[in-house]
Amino acid sequence: CEVDGRYDGSSKFPRGDRFGFFPSFSLGYRISEEKFFEPLRNVVDNLKLRASYGTLGNQDVGSYDYIQSINTQKVMGNYTFDKVSGADYAYADNPVSGALTWEKVIHKNVGLDLSMLSSRLNLSFDAYIRDVKGILTQGKSLPSIYGAAEPMVNANDIRTKGWELTFGWRDSFKIAGRPFHYSLSATLADYKAKYTKV
């Protein structure tokens, strides 16, 4: 059993949303070490069940995307105002969201490891669910007359379900009196992803 926890902070988010706690843990149960498994040990070398749960945070935004900025620029053309050419003017930048926070990734996994025939045959199976919550993306469309791009917001959630099966075989034999080692492996996998919130 292993337990971990991260407490991360980022200045890319506004006060009150800068910190996130991201725990994770994993469990393993080696069935082949149990006493009731002894009759199978001459064939099965290792049989282990695994389970894990983990969370991570993503801060893939600009450094100060939550702060509204005011920019200055020269007036176009060669107009003169009060004997000054190219006068400056100020304008507000694109709108921002004051509630940006961490994009959260939650990964759940169960698995099985199997070794047989003096560890020549190996099999590993994993099934997982991966949820990404509060995906950082552009918000709802603004009217074109507004003249500015949409602010970044934590708008979408996506869920991915999948599995992976790996087979492996390794052995050796002699060629011209010298040992020859070889190994073969194959992997089958599939997954489906869909938005659960848009």
Q: Predicted regions span which residues?
A:
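Extracellular/periplasmic, surface-exposed regions of secreted and cell-surface proteins
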Residues: 1-198
